[in-house]
Amino acid sequence: MDNNNWRPSLPNGEPAMDTGDWRTQLPPDSRQKIVNKIMETLKKHLPFSGPEGINELRRIAARFEEKIFSGALNQTDYLRKISMKMLTMETKSQNAAGSSAAIPAANNGTSIDSIPTNQGQLLPGSLSTNQSQAPQPLLSQTMQNNTASGMTGSTALPSSMPPVSSITNNNTTSVVNQNANMQNVAGMLQDSSGQHGLSSNMFSGPQRQMLGRPHAMSSQQQQQPYLYQQQLQQQLLKQNFQSGNVPNPNSLLPSHIQQQQQNVLQPNQLHSSQQPGVPTSATQPSTVNSAPLQGLHTNQQSSPQLSSQQTTQSMLRQHQSSMLRQHPQSQQASGIHQQQSSLPQQSISPLQQQPTQLMRQQAANSSGIQQKQMMGQHVVGDMQQQHQQRLLNQQNNVMNIQQQQSQQQPLQQPQQQQKQQPPAQQQLMSQQNSLQATHQNPLGTQSNVAGLQQPQQQMLNSQVGNSSLQNNQHSVHMLSQPTVGLQRTHQAGHGLYSSQGQQSQNQPSQQQMMPQLQSHHQQLGLQQQPNLLQQDVQQRLQASGQVTGSLLPPQNVVDQQRQLYQSQRTLPEMPSSSLDSTAQTESANGGDWQEEVYQKIKSMKETYLPDLNEIYQRVAAKLQQDSMPQQQRSDQLEKLRQFKTMLERMIQFLSVSKSNIMPALKDKVAYYEKQIIGFLNMHRPRKPVQQGQLPQSQMQPMQQPQSQTVQDQSHDNQTNPQMQSMSMQGAGPRAQQSSMTNMQSNVLSSRPGVSAPQQNIPSSIPASSLESGQGNTLNNGQQVAMGSMQQNTSQLVNNSSASAQSGLSTLQSNVNQPQLSSSLLQHQHLKQQQDQQMQLKQQFQQRQMQQQQLQARQQQQQQQLQARQQAAQLQQMNDMNDLTSRQGMNVSRGMFQQHSMQGQRANYPLQQLKPGAVSSPQLLQGASPQMSQHLSPQVDQKNTVNKMGTPLQPANSPFVVPSPSSTPLAPSPMQVDSEKPGSSSLSMGNIARQQATGMQGVVQSLAIGTPGISASPLLQEFTSPDGNILNSSTITSGKPSATELPIERLIRAVKSISPQALSSAVSDIGSVVSMVDRIAGSAPGNGSRASVGEDLVAMTKCRLQARNFMTQEGMMATKKMKRHTTAMPLSVASLGGSVGDNYKQFAGSETSDLESTATSDGKKARTETEHALLEEIKEINQRLIDTVVEISDDEDAADPSEVAISSIGCEGTTVRFSFIAVSLSPALKAHLSSTQMSPIQPLRLLVPCSYPNGSPSLLDKLPVETSKENEDLSSKAMARFNILLRSLSQPMSLKDIAKTWDACARAVICEYAQQFGGGTFSSKYGTWEKYVAAS
């Protein structure tokens, strides 16, 4: 064969223009028929499920036909290629069961001297679309079929691949016979045109340009500079392993096998464990002593799907032993590729099933795209390549991880191998940074990573040349697919940091493999990794400002990162079709539908993700408790695991990135949302996230250092008993649970709406789990690492609420628990630290006791003041008891004290503690002496206030003021009515008052918020006179002032609150004032009060708020008014200054659930009112000339909202005032018509049913000032009318309004006429002014 066969030139004599002519002459329906035929063939050989599978097959067939159509030279070539493809599929199906294991050893007799000749043929442009070599059609077709045969390094090459010139006919026959059902051979051969150039350049560092053919280099090769550096290091390392030990039997390999070995490994360059062993003897046969490796490539011609490794253990063992017999002198190096040269796929053992499935998930969805790859669908190859290009960084890091492990394993081998270990150690050091970068990658590509690791793990076993290690192959596979449970075991139990565990932690279906993984990690000898990795973790965190000193235990950081990945940032188990189907459609559809689906999922994420995370954390904590050795509840544990897995799937769905949205997901978004809503309805916390709460960074100035330290202690008290018990037991998940627990407990302090998932941990630990003395000792030691250290850490956590779930939240636990490192040897040093910290703890507690006694005296004074104010609040108390009784909480005073002492627990709605849920205050306080000595009611209250810790109060609370005194009082939200989504929290003063009076339950705040606004703090101030105990002046003086005037409290509160809170308060006050004015039937006067009520949504919702306010002020204290006094929509708006301005707000407001008494009373006399109204209108029309009053139909309403007025309970009659201008002179009429002057528009009013007791309401907007345009007569008349209307007495009559409107209209017309000389009026109307006066 000559080299012309490889050139992409057209056959001799065929004009280039003919390429397009045959396409235009092809009948339009013939292509569709061909696509249908291809699809029918695909259906025979590929499994598919439902319409999605059919659509997938249709897309594949269409894209395949399009590629053939665009690449064919003529119609005959087009049909021939498609026929060959289909024939190959049929042949593959028939021969799927038969294939030989390896190329006969007789081929080894060929000399290697012909390699340079073969190299010369692999020149630039060595690909052709011309399949003119008839003697080898099947091999050519095989090469075509395997553009996408699963080789992770191959790109979409032209669809038709002629034979490799360097392979003889004899070799071709052998390959065809042995690989009829293995398309990987062609995939190996496709990149042969440039592989030797690449191999030679691998010694030149990251410069990877292929000789003369940069355009044909795969995209993955262009994007992986770091990968090639790693490959270079591996090459050099393997040379060190082989030099001096192995001769160079170049005569063992035939030239075509040498060439194919290059082609086999280069497309699989992502498998870095394979690539290090790639020999370069084809280019530099005298430089690299890697012939034993080359000899093993004899069998790689018959090894399809190197990436999936679908072989059986037994065959691998036989194959390895046979290869070792063939090459005894290269036993150590030969194992590297023995398992890669896999046998046919016809027998897949159960051990290999899961790796196979994972690789199928990489290639496409679960409907069988993997098999389509075997049939040579170029489309699938493109999908795979697109997806793999997005995953290059992750795969890079995974390869570095595998390389490290592959070099660590020989540590346990004989000394001969240990002598060669230093290069591996050096390379391990050089690869730490890349390994660490892995932990910051999103873990959404786990399935690809897992499948990618399998061949590398197999290389680990065979690299040392010890066939007995094959017994651990199952464990190695499990290393490729570790789960959360596996991580917990091998990280905490052995003090290891498993990079693979980090990569694939979200595959919980493999938890039963924990013991084998554990033992295998011990065999691998990876104990050298943790120190380096932990140092790097510390350096990275310190560089990002997340570590303030050397107090950060590396193991806790490791666990923290894993937990954060689990709960916040991962895509644990997306449906198998999610990853690659995105790559299929991303380029085709342009991402339009992706954006739409992504926005839907984003909105769902904002709505549901906080609740799901809350439930997930609670379940995870519960799972940790129940997994302790003392509690053997296997069934319940299994249910919890399943429940957690379902939660992970939901969170992963909500956290899907835009690039990973697949077409199938588009139709399932609504279904998933329905499932999530149903799930949340069953398991949602009883109170949603409170609105209007400030982040904790704004709460920090309100707290004294003592309060912060107490908060930190209470946090540790929740988690330290559990961690102590687990440390003493030496349980595997100890470090995982402790870090996760601390992270979650700290998240509480900065995630306002998320309940603490493990708040009941201390109460659920049996007493037996805490050995005598150890629990308290550990608590005391960890509670106070240093007094100032705790305070600083608390401030750091509180001021970083936004990033509490991205790593900062565990800093406090790490600071307070320096002894929880990855090694169990530190427990001896731990006890020494505990003794020292115990002394600090006691000193701190003594100081704290003195402050608490002072606080107790202040509490007594507050109780006395509250007792005096109790009588005035009795009615409100009863109302609030009615509300809170629905919660069924019944938290007594003593229980409430325990409830509050648990740090953040009082801030979350799910903690409805039962008596005895907390074992004792002593346990919570860590055997604090002041708790046992001062358990009086005063101390109870004092501790409650002191222990609230980082309170999260409403954003508009006027009581959040810095206090210069030493009283560490700070407002804290309590549990409020769970049925009110916007319920604001009570102030601490109300909490103290509740305890003093023994009131059961948590009192509902008087300021009931609404979805659109935050609750009014001024109303809260008015309705809670005892709330002044928290005002700054009161706290400063230390003595509540009983004689303080309400106006002083008001002024001080207004000065202390934020503009948003003040706006909300004024809006609520204005709403109530205007509502009272409307019910009374009087106008607001100048309109300033009515103009305040702007938020009508809030006005219609805050029923209890307005009622309590009016009851406080004595306006409407009757029960009837309480039931009926609601901020009703203003349809009967009182005539007044700015009532018309407010009309649009009222017209669009929600339907009131209650009516005003005035409106309901007027309904009874509606017929009488209408009769009297008609009589009055008739009388008005008799007296007025230019103004006509008439009853307007609803159809005449210019604004459709007017029609809705009568339908929302405010019935009345619409009256229209029309200015007909009959008194104008003909000259003025002609002038107005000639200038196209707009006439004065009619004025519409709504006469209520209560008329004449109620004033009519304007339906037209009244202008605030006169328009500057002289021609706008209507605007001028309305402006005048607006001014004169305010002088009318209340209630206004229709007659007075009509007279006023008529006078305004005449005055405007008169002014307009005077601009034209004043002579435009007839002398008959010369006494215009007198007529107006007489009327």
Curated annotation (Swiss-Prot):
Biased composition annotated in UniProt, kind: Low complexity: 258-270, 300-314, 329-362, 401-436, 498-525, 688-712, 957-973
Biased composition (Polar residues): 110-158, 190-207, 241-257, 271-299, 315-328, 363-374, 437-448, 567-588, 716-728, 735-749, 756-815, 1148-1160
Keywords carried by this UniProt record: Coiled coil, Nucleus, Transcription, Transcription regulation
One MF annotation (Gene Ontology) recorded for this entry: chromatin DNA binding
InterPro entries, per the entry: KIX_dom_sf (IPR036529), Med15_C (IPR048386), MED15_KIX (IPR036546), MED15a/b/c-like (IPR044661)
GO cellular component, one term: mediator complex
Compartment(s): Nucleus
The protein's name in its UniProt record: Mediator of RNA polymerase II transcription subunit 15a
Species of provenance: Arabidopsis thaliana
Lineage: Eukaryota, Viridiplantae, Streptophyta, Embryophyta, Tracheophyta
